[in-house]
C-alpha cells in the first residue's frame, strides 16, 4: 500500500480532529480547536511564518498576505468547525476517521469545510515557496463557529473594517459575490 499523497494526509489529519461547533460556547471542546490550530501551524509552516496571523475571538483566524497593491483586497474564507455527528443512522466510515476509500477522503469536514481550509493553505504554502507575491492583498479568514451561525464571521468583518479593508472579492465555500466583474453588469452578482 502506498503512503497517501501529502496533501491528502494533511486533510486526513484535520478531519481526525473533532472540531464540533456548539450553539453555547461554554459547551465547546476548546482542546479540539486548539489542536486544529496547532495542526494547521505544523502542516503549513510557511503560511504561519510569512503571513501575519490574528486570532478572531477564541479560535478563528485572519491571515494577511500582502500583495503588490492593497486597493482590491481578496478574502478567501472557510471554516474550521463541523456539525455534530448524527448517531441515529449508521456510518459507512467513522465520521472522524479521515479514511481514504476509492480515492476519496471520508469524514466530517471533508466537504464542509476543512477541505477548503486545506486547499487554501496548501495553495498559499506552495505559492510562498515559489516566491510568489499576489497582485492584491489576500486575506484568509477561517471561522470557528460557522455551523451555528456564530460570532466569528462578524468579528472577522469588524477586524477587517478596523484595518480599513473593504474587500473587492470574497470567496466562501466555492462561490463569490463579484462587483464590476462582467461587462454590462453594474450590480453585485453571485457566481
Labelled PLM ranges:
Residues 111-191:
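Acidic/histidine-rich catalytic neighborhood of metal-dependent amide-processing enzymes
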Residues 1-110, 130-134:
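Acidic/His- and Gly-rich active-site-bordering loop/insert found
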